[in-house]
């Protein structure tokens, strides 16, 4: 096999070197069908059904199309590329001319990828990092609170109570049942946080990013 051509199905042309030879849509289907089954004898009826779908064609349509394809191949070879089998059909000869079939799928995929990139711009890495960090901080915060509450239950001799400081909007959790000078006496004035205090004097303040002992 010494020659190679490109069958462009999208443009209905047979490309030989720098030259382009126009084919009809039916001739493109015909050449593709014969080439993909190279070496097989395909009957007239099968070729007509496959390459002229849903159409009533004249008896001369198939031989005329075969002749046109042969004329194009004679630009590069004198060998018989498509052989006629009388009263049987036609066969594309193996090891004659290599055909690369271009159905335009590569171009379509390229356009599709470009459209996807245009419609869905990349999310900034920095923004993604901040979102992940925020999620981890919240998870860490919740885990710490649960651990501290469990510790209160384990070591506290009194019942645990909780209430909201109306001045700071902070949640106070404590097992100190005797509250001198008001329920928030001795506690730091920290807004929008969660404050834990036990009867040993331990005070832990948690916000959405960290927990720290006072």
UniProtKB/Swiss-Prot annotation:
Domain of life, per lineage: Bacteria
GO MF term list: DNA binding
CDD domains: trans_reg_C
Transcription recorded as keyword: yes
SMART domains: Trans_reg_C
Listed GO biological process terms: phosphorelay signal transduction system; regulation of DNA-templated transcription
Keywords, sorted A to Z: DNA-binding, Signal, Transcription, Transcription regulation
TM ranges: none
DNA-binding region: 1-94
Record's signal peptide: 1-24
Functional note: Required for expression of pH 6 antigen.
The protein's name in its UniProt record: Protein PsaE
Primary gene name: psaE
């Amino acid at each position: 096999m010494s020659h190679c051509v490109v069958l462009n199905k999208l443009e209905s042309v047979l490309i030989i070197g720098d030259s382009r030879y126009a084919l009809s849509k039916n001739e493109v289907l015909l050449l593709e069908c014969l080439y993909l089954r190279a070496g097989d004898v395909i009957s007239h009826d099968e070729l007509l059904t496959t390459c002229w779908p849903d159409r009533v064609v004249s008896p001369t349509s198939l031989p005329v199309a075969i002749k046109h394809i042969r004329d194009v191949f004679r630009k590069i070879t004198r060998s018989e590329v498509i052989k006629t089998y009388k009263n049987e059909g036609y066969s594309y000869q193996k090891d004659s001319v290599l055909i690369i079939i271009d159905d335009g799928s590569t171009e379509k995929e390229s356009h599709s990828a470009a459209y996807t990139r245009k419609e869905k711009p990349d999310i900034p890495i920095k923004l993604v990092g901040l979102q992940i960090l925020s999620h981890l901080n919240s998870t860490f915060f919740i885990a710490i609170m649960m651990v501290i509450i469990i510790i209160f239950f384990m070591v506290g001799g009194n019942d645990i109570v909780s209430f909201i400081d109306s001045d700071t909007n902070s949640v106070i959790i404590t097992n100190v049942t005797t509250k001198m000078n008001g329920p928030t006496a001795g506690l730091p004035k920290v807004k929008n946080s969660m404050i834990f205090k036990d009867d040993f004097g331990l005070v832990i303040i948690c916000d959405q990013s960290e927990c720290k002992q006072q």
